[in-house]
From Swiss-Prot:
The lineage of its organism: Eukaryota, Metazoa, Chordata, Craniata, Vertebrata. It comes from the Eukaryota. This is Ras-GEF domain-containing family member 1B. It comes from Homo sapiens. GO terms for biological process: Ras protein signal transduction. Guanine nucleotide exchange factor (GEF) with specificity for RAP2A, it doesn't seems to activate other Ras family proteins (in vitro). Induction: Up-regulated in macrophages stimulated with IFNG, GPI-mucins or bacterial lipopolysaccharides (LPS). GO terms for cellular component: early endosome; late endosome; midbody; plasma membrane. Keywords: Endosome, Guanine-nucleotide releasing factor. Residues 204-452 form the Ras-GEF domain.
Amino acid sequence: MPQTPPFSAMFDSSGYNRNLYQSAEDSCGGLYYHDNNLLSGSLEALIQHLVPNVDYYPDRTYIFTFLLSSRLFMHPYELMAKVCHLCVEHQRLSDPDSDKNQMRKIAPKILQLLTEWTETFPYDFRDERMMRNLKDLAHRIASGEEQTYRKNVQQMMQCLIRKLAALSQYEEVLAKISSTSTDRLTVLKTKPQSIQRDIITVCNDPYTLAQQLTHIELERLNYIGPEEFVQAFVQKDPLDNDKSCYSERKKTRNLEAYVEWFNRLSYLVATEICMPVKKKHRARMIEYFIDVARECFNIGNFNSLMAIISGMNMSPVSRLKKTWAKVKTAKFDILEHQMDPSSNFYNYRTALRGAAQRSLTAHSSREKIVIPFFSLLIKDIYFLNEGCANRLPNGHVNFEKFWELAKQVSEFMTWKQVECPFERDRKILQYLLTVPVFSEDALYLASYESEGPENHIEKDRWKSLRSSLLGRV
């Protein structure tokens, strides 16, 4: 079965250099290079550049970049149809009398292209039209005399089906978790005193909690497809008069679920701090989360770290001055400094580069962990997308932009494939994922109940919240 190399080896500081690989420029035309780097091309020429022939196979960096960015201009099923057509027509796979020797040369290359597509962008094949075209082309390859092709085609299809089945199962679990926490949220809003447990009774060790948070982060990262970063920003293609790509719906559900997890963790932290009646218990909870956040930093789990800091900086928590007076904040100040947004998160980006470098030379799974602050990664990709046009004035696809986009996404692809080395604790994971959390209003109410309002505005809000949430005046 054809194997693909790791993502970390795909991109260097420049784009795809045609001197390193055989180029199809002469045969398809319409591609523009500068200093041997592909900068732009017509969409049709770029599609032809994707399709292998007897003497040519596209560089894997080009395959990833084009499959990632092409969805800004056309649906994946439309691209697959064109690829199939080119494979069949150009390589005469539809002709039973075609040269068998040529077939032996081209079949493994087409199979390799299909394998790379199904391995890297498996979610494209949830579309029946994609799967139909894939099966048709795979059948043409497998119907040859070489038994190896049949075996490899079968392995490719089985691997794809396993991935799609795992995705469906994951989505079912997410839906179940979401419904569980939502059902109980109503009870929590109206009767906050009914909640007995807190996070420390479930897990009194901050290091263990940081490890369990890392489990959740890596699992959710793993299910985000690279295409979701592009599909989140899909807009109407100016050369497409009829429709925008993905007009049916933006297929970004796993990316959105991950962002929702960040928000949930922030609210969970704030809830756990605001819930205790006694000041010393609230102070203890703050110090507990500071230790959890510090361990997240040490692990390389920057997303959980930022979610915890965000929760502790929410107004209902930060206003608890008497509680904070009992807290040793030196460690928290250091963590806040690391995640300081000034100078475009310079300190965080420096720490992220350090973690990424550690990951490259890692001797253990733990050292490989890099979980970026996800909202900032999305923001970086958004500004890259907004800052450069998809097409040049001559109608060419601006491929220089997409090299940079693919470089950012491919780094993420490397990080998301790391296996979590820590032992799973189902009880702790269940609590983190399903325990009810306060809404913003409920957080303010709990905060005012703990440390009374300090001015008339807070007093009026407190009365309003007591009336709306508790039915009291």
